[in-house]
């Protein structure tokens, strides 16, 4: 068996279980639907966030956005 025929293996980001990266694995990179839903719930409750730079509202200058009201 050659390396080309072995599927890549990753760890489930939720529980750490070993997961083969195959087209048949409908939950990849997760090991199960349960882990996939746990991850979705963490995004929905904002446990995970994508960092962004806050932008001033339209029409505000940067100085106005920084001043307390």
From Swiss-Prot:
Its cofactor is Zn(2+). One of its GO terms (biological process) is regulation of DNA-templated transcription. The keyword Cell inner membrane does not apply. Keywords: Metal-binding, Zinc. GO terms for molecular function: DNA topoisomerase type II (double strand cut, ATP-hydrolyzing) inhibitor activity; zinc ion binding. It comes from the Bacteria. Transmembrane segments: none annotated. Inhibits all the catalytic activities of DNA gyrase by preventing its interaction with DNA. Acts by binding directly to the C-terminal domain of GyrB, which probably disrupts DNA binding by the gyrase. This is DNA gyrase inhibitor YacG. It comes from Thiobacillus denitrificans (strain ATCC 25259 / T1). The lineage of its organism: Bacteria, Pseudomonadati, Pseudomonadota, Betaproteobacteria, Nitrosomonadales.
């Amino acid at each position: 068996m050659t390396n080309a025929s072995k599927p890549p293996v990753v760890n489930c980001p939720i529980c750490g279980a070993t997961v083969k990266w195959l087209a048949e694995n409908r939950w990849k990179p997760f090991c199960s639907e349960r882990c996939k839903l746990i991850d979705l719930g963490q995004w929905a409750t904002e446990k995970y966030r994508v960092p962004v730079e806050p932008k001033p509202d339209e029409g505000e200058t940067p100085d106005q956005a920084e001043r307390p009201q």
